[in-house]
């Protein structure tokens, strides 16, 4: 049972559906040999078996919805297939049914028509594949767990899909320093489990953990739920191995916390969304597993109170504050309606989830109790509940983590992932509700408040050009006016590549294009993604 | 007085010279207008007035000691000087005496013969200067506080010195988020004071704080004393403004914690040591000022005990551990001999400095006391002392921070800054003592143990080619064998540029050269630095 903290708090029983798990996806048992699963038993595409993808109406082909022209790449020929088969025998997939899931993104908003999926196991194989594609001028779409939010993870036309799903080996783990070196296709949740057994945790965590790959996380510079405490992958990733467009293997897979020998090349690939190279292995430093974790789930009467609660937490919890997430009442309704999760506290306009992670259960509980007393007594919080044991902690987290899933069940989702000055974070949501009126089914706001990161989502029965027109460029212009970012953590992928200019000046865009030309002169890696098409 | 923690600890009076300050340099009062000092009163080069530089024998000209050829850049003409005078009237320095200090590095190991020092105040001025130099093919040496350790901060021949000393304005500070935006020439210690008054701290700290500039810190990707807790500048620097070789201003000066719009260009400039662009402004996130800081200074009987003490601290102090530094007994002798600092504890083979920073004085003291009891009782530590008030904390820190200064007073210093597996960190010091015998005056080891970072220093009466031959490439090969880094935090600059290959594979070096060619096609920015000369 979730422990009510003080008597006036809600003591209702929390969970309607008792058997659910923290990770919503039907997580596949991916063949992490050293993580204890024998490889033979997995069906090749099990890791993509989301219920939200399977079934439902066919997703519109990307070029039918978006104005995009195929670039003059070659088309995969029988000879190409034979060459691939030589490099990775038995792992060249051309079966249309198996290809279907890899051609469609998690949100079911874009669809490519690739005819071939390649499943290498080693960097050497990736290198040989790219060498071949480079020579043959074949476009390539690197794919991890395919949980990306911006249409970057699937082909736009017939690009070869290069999946890291079978590159799922832990290479080494140092149990004093906590430095993990692994292949790019390791599933984040598997890695989490692996390092937790050794008394460490992964420095990042996100709702997609059951499916996303560490390589995909690095390629998107994923933020997620622990960013507030453990910072960006730019600090925690120590090394990368990357295969360049022409097949050259760039080995920067060092396991050193500090290394200032020359330019830090790995940084170019972090967040480059598969457009500059294919990440094949990652070295990452894991923080020690905290001895005590507490989660409080609180109801706030207004957004001003959410902000004030954050300030109070930051001031009083200091170094043990490990997450501060918020969601509005519409989010709560959606997780209730679509996923049958029950609100553990009184209905409120806003909810926040506060997590502490520390090295002394007693000290942490004392700090958190002081905070909770203060926010309750001052009226910043009207109701709340707290959990310390792992199962209950996960239950509370699910309310926040499964919002993305609930939204995707609500209809077509227009997704915006913005960095904004924290004081103005919620204004845009209110503004849009008025602007869109009944044209939108739901306009919701939630996200990583502690990082100034708003997930603004608008759902509708179906994709609608008119609704899109009401949203864009309005949302981007609004954000730019606040000097915010039009993509805080999801990247630009296919769907946001043309809005780069709202957050970056022309000089920067030109430099990015030069960098792309330097590393991928033929432009075969994830074309139509990240950078606006050149004039 | 420094409080003895438990009765068996040393209670001797600590400090021979009562009047000393934490920062050893004769720190200049640099004209940070908004930081409270009127600009008019400073002599132009006051910030370089180190006693260790002034006086003493003339430093050998770099090309006389090192095999390096001047590249075919133009020579500064009267017309160039007139053009500079037009851009920055009154701030073009050609007086040989004033130029002397800017031509010699802090360690007095390299000397250039530049005839002109430029002191712009704005990015626009930097842009105009570089536009002129680019057109005229004049080589440029960006210079911050000139505290660099690898000869990167001074000209090798007659490069134009472009100093950020007058670019010392705070642009903005947000007192909720702690995000500071400032010009590149702000002195780290001034910034520290500025943000501390607002209840934040800088995420980095180093012994050179009284002189080094934030731009120089970013240009060298400085690590320093808070790296263990607050991580790398790659995570804490949020934005940069950079002037490119041709004078183009690249404005990536965002103040957002998260921004995944396109490639993160600022990363290319962090740690690029002035070879890819001139950093003119920095946006950096400052952590809240901890409410309680404790420092313990401990004596350990051996290096194995140092390591075990570290593990104990990490395990028991967890999130409040903010520094773990070590030094050997020779270091202590040198700070005693050259700086008259007194050892606060019993003489020991090794000393460690443990710092905690947290949000509850009571909780932190309790945690630290538990640790200290444990390490004393188990014999890992034989003597120690602890401090909580700021003055005493600074006194203990000085023992560690002033080692660099003590070494520079001991004679010519051969400096190595290595990342090594922590278990083998001290082996190389022992090995070298045997190898060098009486040829070396002192062979000492100290550094950021918590980050696996050893500062290995060898002193001699004077520079000696023979001693150099005994040290190099031996030290680099030894490090490479351990898969370490031949420059953990100091960068490569002029003196280490040719050893890049010990830590990076040829593919990486080639890519770095391409990056340099892309951003600085004429190679005018800090030539002869960071990258090995191309064949
Ligand atoms: C429920 C849910 C919650 C989420 N929560 C968060 C969150 O909190 N924070 C956040 O930042 N993101 C979040 N995301 C989106 C996030 O981008 C992804 O979940 C994750 O980082 C992508 O990993 P992936 O392996 O699925 O990559 P994919 O989706 O397969 O690919 C993403 C991009 O990276 C490229 N890529 C993938 N692997 C490689 C590789 N090895 N080398 C080069 N390029 C590669 C692809 O080409 C594509 O452009 C969430 C997504 C979902 C579905
Ligand atoms: C006593 C002492 C202690 C030190 N401790 C540490 C430590 O703990 N950790 C650590 O990492 N380092 C340490 N250092 C070395 C460290 O590199 C410097 O102190 C500091 O980061 C350099 O800053 P600076 O402003 O003095 O730069 P400079 O020495 O002036 O320049 C260093 C390099 O950066 C370039 N540069 C400077 N400013 C700019 C700019 N605005 N744009 C582009 N390029 C620029 C220069 O061309 C040069 O290549 C120490 C040095 C001393 C003397």
UniProtKB/Swiss-Prot annotation, chains A, B:
Protein residues bound to (R)-malate: 400, 404, 415, 490
Cofactor(s) required for function per UniProt: FAD
Residues annotated for (R)-lactate binding in this entry: 400, 490
Signal peptide bounds: none
Domain called FAD-binding PCMH-type: residue spans: 110-289
Keywords carried by this UniProt record: FAD, Flavoprotein, Metal-binding, Mitochondrion, Oxidoreductase, Transit peptide, Zinc
Enzyme class: oxidoreductase
Transmembrane segments: none
UniProt-recorded name of the protein: D-2-hydroxyglutarate dehydrogenase, mitochondrial
Organism, as annotated: Mus musculus
Name of the gene encoding the protein in the UniProt record: D2hgdh
């Amino acid at each position: 049972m979730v422990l009510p903290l003080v008597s006036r708090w809600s003591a209702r029983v929390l969970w309607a559906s008792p058997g659910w798990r923290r990770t919503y996806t039907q997580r596949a048992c991916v063949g992490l040999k050293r993580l204890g699963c024998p490889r033979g038993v997995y069906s090749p595409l099990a890791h993509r078996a989301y219920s939200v993808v399977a079934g439902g109406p066919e997703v519109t082909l990307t070029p039918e919805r978006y104005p995009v022209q195929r670039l003059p790449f070659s088309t995969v020929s029988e000879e190409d297939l034979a060459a691939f088969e030589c490099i990775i025998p038995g792992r060249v997939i051309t079966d249309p049914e198996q290809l279907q899931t890899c051609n469609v993104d998690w949100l079911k908003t874009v669809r490519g028509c690739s005819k071939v999926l390649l499943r290498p196991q080693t960097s050497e194989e990736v290198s040989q594949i790219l060498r071949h594609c480079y020579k043959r001028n074949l476009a390539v779409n690197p794919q991890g767990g395919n949980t990306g939010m911006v249409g970057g993870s699937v082909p736009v036309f017939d690009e070869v899909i290069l999946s890291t799903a079978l590159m799922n080996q832990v290479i080494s783990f140092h149990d004093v320093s906590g430095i993990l070196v692994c292949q790019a296709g390791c599933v984040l949740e598997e890695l989490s489990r692996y390092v937790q057994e050794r008394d460490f945790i992964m420095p990042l965590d996100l709702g997609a953990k059951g499916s996303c790959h560490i390589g995909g996380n690095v390629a998107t510079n994923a933020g997620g739920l622990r960013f507030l405490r453990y910072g960006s992958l730019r600090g925690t990733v120590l090394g990368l191995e990357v295969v360049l467009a022409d097949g050259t293997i760039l080995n920067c897979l060092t396991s050193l916390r500090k290394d200032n020998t020359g330019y830090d090349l790995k940084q170019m690939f972090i967040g480059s969304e598969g457009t500059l190279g294919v990440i094949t292995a990652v070295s990452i430093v894991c923080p020690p597993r905290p001895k005590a974790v507490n989660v409080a789930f609180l109801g706030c009467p207004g957004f001003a109170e959410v902000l004030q609660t954050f300030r109070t937490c930051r001031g009083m919890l200091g170094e043990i504050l490990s997450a501060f997430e918020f969601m509005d009442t519409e989010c709560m309704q959606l997780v209730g309606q679509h996923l049958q999760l029950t609100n553990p506290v009184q209905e409120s306009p806003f909810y926040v989830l506060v997590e502490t992670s520390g090295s002394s259960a007693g000290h942490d509980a004392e700090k958190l109790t002081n905070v909770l007393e203060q926010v309750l007594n001052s009226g910043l919080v009207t109701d709340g509940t707290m959990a310390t044991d792992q199962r209950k902690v996960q239950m509370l987290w699910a309310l926040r983590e499964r919002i993305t899933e609930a939204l995707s069940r609500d209809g077509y989702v227009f997704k915006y992932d913005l960095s904004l000055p924290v004081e103005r974070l919620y204004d845009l949501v209110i503004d849009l509700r008025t602007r869109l009126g009944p044209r939108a089914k739901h306009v919701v706001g939630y996200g990583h408040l502690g990082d100034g990161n708003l997930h603004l989502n608008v759902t509708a029965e179906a994709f609608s050009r008119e609704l899109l027109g009401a949203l864009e460029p309005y949302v981007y212009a609004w954000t730019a006016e606040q000097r915010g970012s039009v993509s805080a953590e999801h990247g630009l992928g296919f769907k946001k590549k043309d809005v780069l200019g709202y957050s970056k000046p022309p000089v920067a865009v030109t430099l990015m294009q030069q960098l792309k030309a330097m590393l991928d002169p033929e432009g075969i890696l994830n074309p139509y993604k990240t950078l606006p098409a050149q004039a």
